[in-house]
Amino acid sequence: MQIFVKTLTGKTITLEVESSDTIDNVKAKIQDKEGIPPDQQRLIFAGKQLEDGRTLSDYNIQKESTLHLVLRLRGG
């Protein structure tokens, strides 16, 4: 199924995923497309931050859902 990931810059990334994919998997796909390391990614859906070990179906994320990607930058 397709889901969308919207970044803070307003860019929308389209990902091909399965309901059984973990949030880890999704972050890895985002890394493939955007080059953003998973440890800097925070994914938000319906106002909740998504935890790495959970699956998309745990959060009731269905096809064409939009997730929001927030970057967690290391404090310098």
Curated annotation (Swiss-Prot):
Q: What is the lineage of its organism?
A: Eukaryota, Fungi, Dikarya, Basidiomycota, Agaricomycotina
SUPFAM superfamilies from the entry? Ubiquitin-like
Q: Where is the Ubiquitin-like domain?
A: 1-76
Its function, per the record, reads: Ubiquitin exists either covalently attached to another protein, or free (unanchored). When covalently bound, it is conjugated to target proteins via an isopeptide bond either as a monomer (monoubiquitin), a polymer linked via different Lys residues of the ubiquitin (polyubiquitin chains) or a linear polymer linked via the initiator Met of the ubiquitin (linear polyubiquitin chains).
For this protein, the record's Pfam families field holds: ubiquitin
Q: Where is this cross-link: Glycyl lysine isopeptide (Gly-Lys) (interchain with K-? in acceptor proteins)?
A: 76
CDD domains found in the cross-reference section: Ubl_ubiquitin
The reply to whether Thylakoid figures as a keyword in the UniProt entry is no
Alphabetically list the UniProt keywords.
Cytoplasm, Isopeptide bond, Nucleus, Ubl conjugation
Q: What is this protein called?
A: Ubiquitin
**Where in the cell?**
Cytoplasm; Nucleus
Cross-link Glycyl lysine isopeptide (Lys-Gly) (interchain with G-Cter in ubiquitin) residue location(s): 6, 11, 27, 29, 33, 48, 63
Annotated GO CC locations = cytoplasm; nucleus
- What organism is this sequence from? Coprinellus congregatus
Q: Which family does it belong to?
A: Belongs to the ubiquitin family.
Instruction: Report whether Transmembrane shows up as a keyword of the record.
Output: no
